[in-house]
Amino acid sequence: MVTPEVRSQIDTGSGPVGAAWIRPRGAVATLVVAHGAGTGMDHPFMAGFARAIAEHGVATLRFNFPYIERGRRSPDPEGVLRATWLAAFEDARSRSDGRPVLAGGKSLGGRIASMAVADGMPAAGLVFLGYPFHAPGKPERVRDEHLYRITVPMLFIQGTADPFARPEVVRKVLRKLGRAAEHVPVEGGDHSFNVRGHKRDAREVGESVAELAAPFVRRVAGAG
């Protein structure tokens, strides 16, 4: 039986934003997952990811940042993004019946989650679906300082051809993070996990990435 998706809203302090729950029966954990800079929570990648990871007993809460709700292209100021993340996390925690709540997201969504956790948001773990370590063409300017303040388990799913994550940069950061971090490379994958010569739609890509994330989430929840 397919678990239904339930729509809701979250009050963020900058106005309500849309949200979507998928809660499979007997879920072992909740993963709050945020979209990347150029897409909203209903992008096929996000929807496919949430639907597929539910098959592994993981509930998900997806949500929009305010700029997406308003039809804008440019992301909100960092303070608004972080406040939205905190509101979404608290909403998830209040509805998870004591289950572990993890945080994560695609690119921007995952980066803001990591900043919130570094500053105290009590997630049980972090799942990065293409972490943006640096701007394309600027691997010398790595955005990693706050990662070393994080004490919960982290999973980095990264395409090896991602212009935001040169493999040598990823390896260096992971060495410094030590056992707190796990790395799952997607061979030939770009920032959207597309692999040249292997055409798939975004929903299928999201589903395949969920298969990589699910074992980590279940393990953090003590159900792996």
List the model feature ranges, each with a label.
Residues M46, R143, V152, A165-L174:
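Short alpha-helix in the alpha/beta-hydrolase fold that links the catalytic acid
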Residues K176-N194:
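Catalytic histidine neighborhood in serine/cysteine hydrolases
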